UniProtKB/Swiss-Prot annotation:
One of its GO terms (molecular function) is unfolded protein binding. One of the proteins required for the normal export of preproteins out of the cell cytoplasm. It is a molecular chaperone that binds to a subset of precursor proteins, maintaining them in a translocation-competent state. It also specifically binds to its receptor SecA. Belongs to the SecB family. This is Protein-export protein SecB. InterPro entries: SecB (IPR003708), SecB-like_sf (IPR035958).
Amino acid sequence: MSEQKQDVAATEEQQPVLQIQRIYVKDVSFEAPNLPHIFQQEWKPKLGFDLSTETTQVGDDLYEVVLNISVETTLEDSGDVAFICEVKQAGVFTISGLEDVQMAHCLTSQCPNMLFPYARELVSNLVNRGTFPALNLSPVNFDALFVEYMNRQQAENAEEKSEEEQTKH
């Protein structure tokens, strides 16, 4: 009977854990440098969108993940900047029981995927408060971005090994 309890306890310890501890806005900025005259121009926006993540271990099995979103909208005809919106949506997560690749996937895909709806809503609200037409960011496939990143890493590693072999000969 006690062996079964030990086996169950050992199995529970090995189970992967991903828990949200806190989600918060770390930084936010909205600039509309050409108001009010921008509204007198024809609204043909050109949208620039950048997305990145930062990860910091803040304790045992505790990680802060920051999703950085930057949106810059200019008018096609004049090139004038309509607005710049920057959001750093962050969260602290308890993560344990994962191997290296699984941990990387969790930190760069799963956690940002949880943060994105909050960031998207904040961007939409800021643009709305600037009295610009609605901006609804499309969903982001963080899994595809992770696979793309891993493929780039593998290609770079293969290239480095190839260069090392060529210098040896």
